[in-house]
Amino acid sequence: MTDELAGKVAIVTGGAAGLGEGLVRRFAAEGANVVIGDIDRDGGAALAAEIGDNALFIEADVAEIDQVSGLVSTAVEHFGGLHVMVNNAGVSGTMHRRFLDDDLADFRKVMAINVGAVMAGTRDAARHMSKHGGGSIINLTSIGGIQAGGGVMTYRASKAAVIQFTKSAAIELAHYEIRVNAIAPGNIRTAIVRKSAAGADLQKLEEFEAKIRQQMRDDRPMKREGTLEDVAEAALYFATDRSRYVTGTVLPVDGGTVAGKVIARK
């Protein structure tokens, strides 16, 4: 590790597990003071305790806008500033349901968390950063927001919205030296899928996952699944001064999936 984030303060929403946990651990290892925002009280508190004094857990439901604001104000109060904001928290919505059977309740929930919380987190972080020399805002989207496809259509729409919001915010906030970028992971194996599918038939879920993952491995130029470390490396780049002239960028971390499918050679 290089201590690239020594003296910096970062917030990671949805930081108690999955991709968020990977980012929290990497940022802390690089010397950052990290605020973990999550609804998982036990998981978040345990992670903060494991990391030590440079981590703080705040129980927060990002679907509630005022709780997003509370994350920023608490981070500034506790650690003395805010340099990096990672809007990572997200949900997939109801899985294995046909679009014709979707309802507005699911749509509203997905949009509130995947889009509304990203907008609120960006706004509240930027309000502080604009008065203190700038900073970096990193939004987690998905290759599902880049490529069209059947299934989880509300999720895809929400992630596409994050991409356009990121680019627009980057333009508006560049004057303040605030960089806004997005990471679009693809096929990163975490526990988040199982959490979001709570209540679903576990056997059917496992069969569905296995089928989709095999199909994606067959189509992807790089024949492996991505890791938390792959995403953390991208986030570290955006969080540090190495990306000081990079804003409005959407970086797929997907083994080449969005570049195109592999054509079988005989």
Placement of each model-derived feature along the sequence:
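Substrate-binding pocket helix/loop in short-chain dehydrogenase/reductase
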Residues: 95-99, 103-108, 216
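Alpha-helical segment proximal to the catalytic Tyr-Lys
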Residues: 127, 171-175, 244
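Short C-terminal tail/terminal secondary-structure segment
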Residues: 96, 236, 247-266
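Residue(s) in the substrate-gating loop at a strand-loop-helix junction
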Residues: 142
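Short, flexible catalytic-loop segment of classical short-chain dehydrogenase/reductase
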Residues: 184-200
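Canonical Rossmann dinucleotide-binding motif of NAD(H)/NADP(H)-dependent dehydrogenases/reductases
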Residues: 3-35
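Active-site helix of classical SDR
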Residues: 122, 158, 166
